[in-house]
Amino acid sequence: MKKLTYLTLSLFSIFTFAQEISKERVKTVLSTLASDEMKGREIGTQENENAANYIAALFKENNLEYCTGKSYLVPFDYNGKTVYNVCGIKKGKSDQYLGFSGHFDHIGTSDKSGDNIYNGADDDASGITTLVGIADYFKNKRPEFSMVFMAFNGEEKGMLGSRAISTDKNLDHIYNKMTALFNFEMVATESQWGKNALYMTGDGFSDLDELFNQNAVNGLKINADPYAKQQLFYRSDNVSFVKKKIIAHSFSTVDMTKASHYHHENDDVNIVDFDNMTQIINNLGKTLDKLSPKNFAPKYNDQVKF
């Protein structure tokens, strides 16, 4: 009886704590995407396709289902060349979806001598690492919401990938049931509010942040957009879904009054706060685990422009 009890407790511990994401995992995913070998992941390059395949492999590790067809890779055309977004599904108890996204492309390399690779660790390998971390968290759990994970291509060329996938009729079965989209854009550094905090672009357009914060665990907080005048809400991939009248916001930690790495060669792993990222990812997972269609149904107000 004691052995059985010990075994039961051991199994309980495994399944209770297995979803906790390690800093080593966060480092591995982000460092791979932001490595020199990826050469800045510019859309249309072999390295960009390598990044897409790497993300697809991570989705497979997490046993995600395909969004459409027989692959995580969702093709679209870029200057006569086939390029890819990456998309995977986690079925939950409800058929209502929460979406998690970021963009994996960056701006490639320059012609100058020395360090000429724009690694894009913060922009936006950090966002992809965050959504992969959420998928990791729920690998052995069944969330209340179903979940869709989307890694967009071509953001740096004008949000091409998010525009393509948001208008893909093969995914309407997801979009018609989507409660909200969390788009992660530059979350590698500590925010102006300190650790364990993000801000939401366009916070004045919906009550998503309020509803999320009501359920947030361990001090995690989504703050108001400190750069509202720059209208970042309309300048990132979330806007492709805003146009579909889906609740969609971007979430960031970057302090734009201090950051010197945006679209520069020094946006590499050396500027990443892996402890903070790991804390945020785990607390996002724990908070999302509390959300259901009963306590999380955000709505736009009449201030948003579609």
Where are these regions (language model features)?
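Bacterial Sec-dependent N-terminal signal peptides
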Residues: 1-21
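N-terminal capping segment at the start of a domain
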Residues: 21-50, 62, 186, 258-264
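Second-shell loop/turn segments in exported
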Residues: 36-46, 74-77, 113-124, 137, ...
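A non-catalytic alpha/beta surface segment that caps or lines the substrate-entry region
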Residues: 41-91
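Alpha-helical metal-binding/catalytic segments enriched in His/Glu/Asp
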Residues: 88, 100, 106, 111-158, ...
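Metal-dependent peptidase/peptidase-like ectodomains
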Residues: 152-250, 299
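Zn-dependent metallopeptidase/amidohydrolase metal-coordination segment
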Residues: 230-277
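His/Asp/Glu-rich mid-to-C-terminal helical/loop segments that flank catalytic regions of hydrolases
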Residues: 258-306
